Amino acid sequence: LTQAQDNMTGCADANIGRGFAGPSYQDMDQIEYITIATTGDAADFGTTIVDCYGAAATSDGIYGWWHGGRASGGWGNASNTIQYLVTATLGDASDWGDLDFAGYTYSCTCSVADARVVQLGGYASSDYRNEIDYYTTASAGNSSDFGNLTVGRSGIATLGNGTGAVAGGGFPSGGPVTDLMDYI
């Protein structure tokens, strides 16, 4: 990385062999990338349109998306912005649309087969959220309601295979961390 950072989120694009990381608490709008096939340091890719520490990220091999996150100045400065970049071209992120609520520590997964990005849970307005939202990768737009997690929580690990997705773990209201898994 170009500087010491923590609590970053990232996504990868195997088609062009790049991995993307950022933003972090230290640099809330910075996106960096590495070339997976070679050793070496990260380089500047561009910046996000809004600060988004604690955002979730995913990629479909063409675009990379960042969801929500927060700006400096405290936990109350959350965003509902969906930002994207074209993974093959260096440059700044652009606005894709909005999530249903502003928050951070979301989790998300991309399902290439049915061209959807699914965003799960998160933390907003002093509440651990149970919402599951989605949007299609075919064109920019706002997210829509998909359903609910069994328990609202943030910091969930997610993965999808084009048919379904699994959301595991996370931090529910009142803690401690959970071993709960949801399947969609």
Model-derived features with residue positions:
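Polar, enzyme-active/binding microenvironments
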Residues: L1-I184
